[in-house]
Amino acid sequence: MADLSSVDEFLNQCKQSGDAAYGALRSVLERLEDPNTRSKARIFLSDIYKRVGSSETSLQTYHFHIQDIYLDQYEGFQSRKKLTMMVIPSIFIPEDWSFTFYEGLNRHPDTIFKDKTVSELGCGNGWISIAIAAKWLPSKVYGLDINPRAVKISWINLYLNALDDNGEPVYDEEKKTLLDRVEFYESDLLGYCRDNKIQLERIVGCIPQILNPNPEAMSKLITENASEEFLHSLSNYCALQGFVEDQFGLGLIARAVEEGISVIKPAGIMIFNMGGRPGQGVCRRLFERRGVRVTQMWQTKILQAADTDISALVEIERSSPHRFEFFMGLSGDQPICARTAWAYGKAGGRISHALSVYSCQIRQPNLVKIIFDFLKNGFQEISNSLDLSFEDETVADEKIPFLAYLASVLKNSSYFPFEPPAGSKRFCSLIAGFMRTYHRIPINQDNIVVFPSRAVAIESAFRLFSPRLAIVDEHLTRQLPRSWLTSLAIEDTSMDKSDDQITVIESPHQSDLMIELIKKLKPQVVVTGMAPFEVITSSSFLHLLEVTKEIGCRLFLDISDHFELSSLPASNGVLKYLAENQLPSHAAIICGLVKNKVYSDLEVAFVITEVDAIAKALSKTVEVLEGHTAIISQYYYGCLFHELLAFQLADRHAPAERESEKAKSEEIIGFSSSAVSILKDAELSVTEIDETSLIHMDVDQSFLQIPQSVKAAIFESFVRQNISEAEVDINPSIKQFVWSNYGFPTKSSTGFVYADGSLALFNKLVICCAQEGGTLCLPAGTNGNYVAAAKFLKANVVNIPTESSDGFKLTEKTLTKALESVKKPWVCISGPTVSPTGLVYSNEEMDILLSTCAKFGAKVIIDTSFSGLEYSATSWDLKNALSKMDSSLSVSLLGCLSLNLLSGAIKLGFLVLDQSLIDAFHTLPGLSKPHSTVKYAAKKMLALKEEKASDFLDAVSETIKTLEGRSRRLKEVLQNSGWEVIQPSAGISMVAKPKAYLNKKVKLKAGDGQEIVELTDSNMRDVFLSHTGVCLNSGSWTGIPGYCRFSFALEDSEFDKAIESIAQFKSVLAN
C-alpha cells in the first residue's frame, strides 16, 4: 500500500509502470472508502494535483493525469463550473467524442434528469455521470463500465469532486453530496441493473463503435490485472455482438438499445452518441427498427482520434457494398470512404466524421418490452429480422399490439390449444363485444360463425341450402364455381325438384335493380352487398328484407365494404337497424374482414344469424368443408377488436330493447336433405358443452410441444417487413419436399395449389370428380372427415372393404375387386401413414396399388397429410413405381405441413396436381389461400428440414419417440380394459375395438336418475364422452365397424388424464 504521508513516495511508485501507478491509486481509493481516513486521503489527492499539475506529460511520467473539465461557460449557471478528473492509460480518455456527447445532453430541458434514476453505459473515468449528478440533481446515477480499472478510477473521481480540497463534503441545494447520488459498478452494458432488477428512467451511453482490428483480443477474460493494452482496447473498440449492425461497427450500440428496452421504465429516455461513419440512415434505422423514436439533439464534426485504427471498417467495405462516411479535415463537406480515409490518415492527413446525439423513446413501450422479452428467451436470431419502423402511426398502432400478443402466446404456451372449427371462442366473443359496444347490437358469441373468407362463407351457405336458383351481387360472383354461373336450369324452381343443381344469376350491385330481379325470378337464396349511398340509412336493407320474406327467400347481406374496425365507425344503416330490431329468421349478415392497415391479403369472415339452428348448421358446414379457420388470422383480427374494447368500461349501457320478428316466412328454403343427413351422422367436434372439461382425442391436430425453431419461423414471418416475392414463393420448397420425402417427381406442367389445410383441397378434388361423373373410391378405414365431406358434396362414393388381417390397408385383391365394377374411378390412398390406423404402406405395397389403379385407368390421390412421423425409418420412393406406369396415369399428391413440421395449428395444405386436372380444378376458385406469413414460415421450416438443422431434427426425433411411447402405453391400457387394438407404426392416432363393451347394456347417469343403454357404434362416442369426458371417434367415423379412433398427440397432463379416464371406463360393465 502506498505511503499517504509522502507525495514523493507515491509519485516514485507511479513512475515505475502503469500497473504500479494503478496499484498506488487503488490504495488511495481504499482510504477514500473508509470514512475514518476519507478526509485525509482527499487532502492527499489535492497535494498530488498541486505537485503534478494538469500537464499531459504526467501521463507519460507518472502514468496518470489530472485535469479540470469546465462544465458551463454561460452566466446563470448556479452549480459548480468545473470537475477535477483523473485518467490512466488503460481507460477511455475524455476527448471530443465525450465532450460532444455532454453538449448533446445539455440541449435537453433542465428537467431531463431531475429526480430520475439514471445509468451511464461506458462511463470511462466517470466524468459524465458525475457531471449529470452535479448539474441536474438526479435521484441516482449508476456509472457502468466493463473495464474494472475504469470503475476504480471513477470512484476516485467521485471522491475527488464530492469532497473539497480540505476533505470536507460539498453539498448541493438539496443538502446532498455527489456520494449520495452516484455509484459506479463493473458491468457489461446494463448487466448490473438487470441482475439487480433496477428500473431506470434515463440511460445515456457514449459507447465504442469501431470493431477491434484484433477480434481475438476481445474474447480474453476481463480482469483488473489484464494488460494495459487490452484494457485500453476494451474501452475504445467493440467486439462482434451477433447483430446485423455488426457490419457497421454498431453491434454494441444495438445490444445496448435492446438491453435498455428491458430495464427502462415505459416513459424513459435513452440518449446515445452516434458516430456518423456508417451514414445517418444506418444510425437512425438501428433505433427505429427496434420500435424506438429518434430525435437528433445535436450534430457536429470531430476529428478521428489519431490512435483509433479504422482498418476494420476498410475490411467491411472490401466485403460489402456499404461505404462509410469520413471527411478530409473539419472543413471538408464531401464524404470519403473508409479506405480513402485510411490512406489519407496514413499519409499524415487529419480525417473527421459526423457525430450526433440521439434522444430515444420507445413507442408503445409496454408492448415493445413484451416483444423483446420474448426475443431474449432463445429467439435472439430473429432480432436481426425485427422491423418496428413505421412511417404511418396507424400501422404501428395495429402491428405492434399484435406482435406483442403473438409473442405472449408463443412464450407462454408450448402448443396451440384446440379451438372450435367455426371460430375460437375468444374471437367470436370479441366480435360480439364490438357489436354490442360500438353498434348497440345485443348479440353473443353463439350468434357468430367464423369462416376463412367471405367467398368460403357464401359457397358454404349455398352447399348447406342447395338452392336451385340464387341471385348474387355481381361483385360477389368471382369466387363461385363456374358451373353455377353457366347453368340455365331456371325454368322450374318448385320445392320438390332434385336439389343437385345450383344456378346462380348475376345481379347489378344497385338494390332497386336487385329487387326487381328478385320479384321476377323468385330465387330461393339472395346474396348481395349494398352501394355506399344505400348503406347510410336502413331503408334499402328494410326493403330487401321485406321483398325476400314475401317470396320465401333467404337473404345473405354482405357488409364487408362498409364494416369499419375503428373507435369511431361511420354510420351504417344495416347495423342501426339491427340495434333496434332482431335480425329476421330468413336473413343473415356476412362480413369479410379485410380492412386492416398492414396486410391487405389477410382475411377472415364471420356470419351473424340469430337463429340457433342456422348457426349450428353453418358451424358444422365450415368444419366439414374447411376443417378450420386459420388461427393466426383470428389472432390478428382478434387483437384489433381487443384494442378497440380494452379501454371501454364494461356494460355501461343496458342491452337494447329490440323489436321481435312479427311473422316468419312459411315457405322459406331449408337445409338440403343430404346436408341434414350428413351433418347429423358426421362425428364433428364436440363444442356444445363446457370446453374446459373435454379431452380431445378426436381431432387431427398435435398438442405436443412446438420446437423453438418453429416458433421462431412463425414470429419472424410477422416481425419482418418488405418480404420479397421470392421469400414467400413456396413452390421450389414443396417440389423439393415431395421429392426428398416421397420421391414424387414434378414437371413444368405440374400444378401447385395451396390452402389453409388439406381438407379444403381434398373437397375441390371431390367436386372435380363429381363434375366428370367419376366415382370416389375410399377404403374402409379412411379418415372420417374426408368421408363426411365427400358425401356432403354429393359425390358418388364407393367404400372399398378392407380386412383386419391386412391392418385395414388396401391390397391388390380388395382394390381390384372394387374397381372391376366402378366407372371412372378416383382412388384416394392415405400414405405413407394411414389415417386413422397409424399403419404404414411400404414401397412395394404402393407399387402394387398404383399398378392396379393404372390397369383400371383410375385417377389416384395420394394423401400424405398425416405422414412424416413414422416410428421407424420409412423411405418412400414413388419415382420408381411411377416410371413403370403408363404416362396417362393421373396421380396427384395431397399434403399438409403441420404434423411433419411440428407446427400444431399453423397449417399449410398443398396439392401437387396432375396436369390433366389443372383446368377442371381452376373452375373452382373459392379456396381460402394461406397468408403470405404462413408461406414464409413454412418455407423457413422446410429449409430447416432439408438442411437437417440439428435442433429441428432433434425435436422431430423426440416427438416421434414420445408418440411411439404413448401408442404403447395407450395400447396396454386399452387391452387391459377389454379393447382389441391395432398397434400403430406412425402418426398420432390408433384404432381399437371395444370388444368387451359392444352390444352390452350399461347403466349411465341421466339427469337425476339412470338409464340403461346398449353400446353400439352409433352411441359409443356419446356414452364414452358422458362417462369419461374424452372425445373419441366411433366405428361410424372410422368406417371400420366397431373400431374407434384415439388421437394421442395431447399435452402431457391431458394425456395422463385421458389414460386414467379410459382405464376407469371399464367400470360401466360393473353395472
Curated annotation (Swiss-Prot):
A single cellular component GO annotation: cytosol
InterPro entries the UniProt entry points to: Aminotransferase_I/II_large, Met_S-MeTrfase, PyrdxlP-dep_Trfase, PyrdxlP-dep_Trfase_major, PyrdxlP-dep_Trfase_small, SAM-dependent_MTases_sf
Keyword terms: Acetylation, Cytoplasm, Methyltransferase, S-adenosyl-L-methionine, Transferase
Major subcellular location class: cytoplasm
EC number: 2.1.1.12
Record has Transferase as a keyword: yes
Catalytic activity: L-methionine + S-adenosyl-L-methionine = S-methyl-L-methionine + S-adenosyl-L-homocysteine
Cellular localisation: Cytoplasm
Residue positions, PTM N-acetylalanine: 2
Top-level taxon: Eukaryota
Assigned protein family: Belongs to the class I-like SAM-binding methyltransferase superfamily.
Official protein name in the record: Methionine S-methyltransferase
Gene coding for it: MMT1
